[in-house]
Amino acid sequence: SNIANRDRGLPRSILTTLLNDPDTGAPIAFLSANALSATRTGAIPAVGAKYLAKKEAKTVALIGAGVIGRACLNALLVVLKEAEQIKVYDLNQEAAQEYCRELTQEYGIPARAVGSVEEAVRDSDVINVATAGAVSPQIEDEWLKDGVLLTLPASAGLSENTMQTSTIVVDNWKMYEAYAQELRDMPGGFSANLSGICGYLMDLVYSGKLNQEDVINLGDVIAGNRPGRVSQSQRIIFIMDGMAVEDLAWGYTVYENACKMGIGTKLNLWERGK
């Protein structure tokens, strides 16, 4: 990722995926992965909402209306069948207003651009944060209504009280434990290398301010091993750091579909037997 790419007329991130045969190691597909990554990143908050949002969630808020944010909202609207209102906050207000016009036309749901993070958060049933940059949007505890689902594919500033009084769900806690071990081995140690919402969560857990047993894996909710939403007033925060297996699964699906449709270019990497 290189923010200076924008000045060069390029995407901030230029992503690729290489799929290999698991038996031989031979490459089977080389994919441009910007759209692939955005789609899978957007899908994960929606999977969370399917299992964690209130059934009658009516107001959806999007903080950050870039490529990832739009992918998240597209997926969320697939599962939030009762959505009646969309609020969008973005630093680029003109772009947010144009996006809201597109949303209303495409989905038939009233969408409006709002002027602050607070306005987006207050009275919203599902809130997705997908901002970029060094400064994360600050979300105050009193802005979050009872029963809210806050999905975080990106970081947000949350108080310790917000974290301690909400149900915390993650994509894969074992992955966070592996990150923690890597951080301990880095110069400066664990605390010096923490960043983002995932680092904040790990710091709260390892400092004893949150009980690790109270952090729930989304997979356990889906499998029925742990409860997700148990009341309409329960506030839930779904934190995700992204897993490569998601790119792999979606990338292979795209590859299979491309083969069926005859899309793509065959590359001759070597002569047979050489």
Predicted regions: what they are:
Residues 162-273:
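Adenosine-phosphate binding glycine-rich loop
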Residues 109-123, 139:
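Short acidic low-complexity segments
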Residues 122-123, 134-149, 154, 160:
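Rossmann-fold NAD(P) dinucleotide-binding segment
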Residues 79-106:
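NAD(P)-binding Rossmann-fold cofactor-contacting core
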Residues 52-59, 82-83, 145-146:
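Short helix-loop-beta connector
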Residues 69-70:
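N-terminal Rossmann-fold NAD(P) dinucleotide-binding loop
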Residues 1-38, 44-46, 56, 216, ...:
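N-terminal ligand-binding/catalytic initiation module
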Residues 65-66:
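Glycine-rich Rossmann-fold phosphate-binding loop(s) that bind the pyrophosphate
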